[in-house]
């Protein structure tokens, strides 16, 4: 089964030894705890930005070199990869107890959630693929312009 995150993605965020301690002493890339934490993180991100952005495209797993004409192209948004790992690791640490979560891990989790809130609300622009309306072929937007002022007619 192809997954969005690769084993090599974790190397920039956490040492392999610590990740093995969190997931058990088995092959940690196939570990059920890790898979569940990744799925939870992806669901959390989808819930925050899914109304504006095409999450099916964002979370598309990498194609293997055999499926991609012999080339390994990483088309994933690296910021999304980073915050997915941050949220995944926070969930893995959380199962050990709230006092055992390192401060930097809690801060990175909170930063990721704050960014997702801002992007989901439209306060922070990003270059993720927007949802396209099949009828108009334009990006779906829920932007509405209104005013609390009553309309004025100044014609005399």
Regions from the PLM with identified roles:
Residues 40, 44, 83, 87-91, ...:
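Generic beta-strand or strand-like secondary-structure segments
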């Amino acid at each position: 089964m192809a997954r969005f995150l690769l084993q090599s993605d974790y190397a920039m965020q956490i040492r392999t030894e610590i990740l093995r301690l969190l997931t058990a002493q088995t092959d940690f890339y196939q570990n059920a705890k890790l898979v569940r934490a990744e799925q939870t993180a992806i669901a959390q991100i989808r819930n925050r930005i899914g109304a504006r952005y095409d999450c099916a495209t964002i979370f598309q797993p990498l194609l293997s070199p055999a499926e991609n004409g012999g080339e390994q192209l990483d088309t994933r948004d690296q910021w999304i990869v980073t915050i997915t790992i941050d949220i995944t690791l926070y969930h893995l640490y959380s199962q050990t107890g709230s006092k055992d979560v390192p401060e930097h891990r809690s801060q990175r989790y909170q930063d990721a959630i704050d960014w997702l809130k801002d992007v989901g609300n439209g306060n922070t622009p990003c270059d993720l693929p927007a949802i396209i309306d099949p009828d108009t072929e334009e990006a779906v937007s829920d932007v509405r312009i209104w005013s609390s002022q009553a309309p004025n007619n100044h014609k005399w």
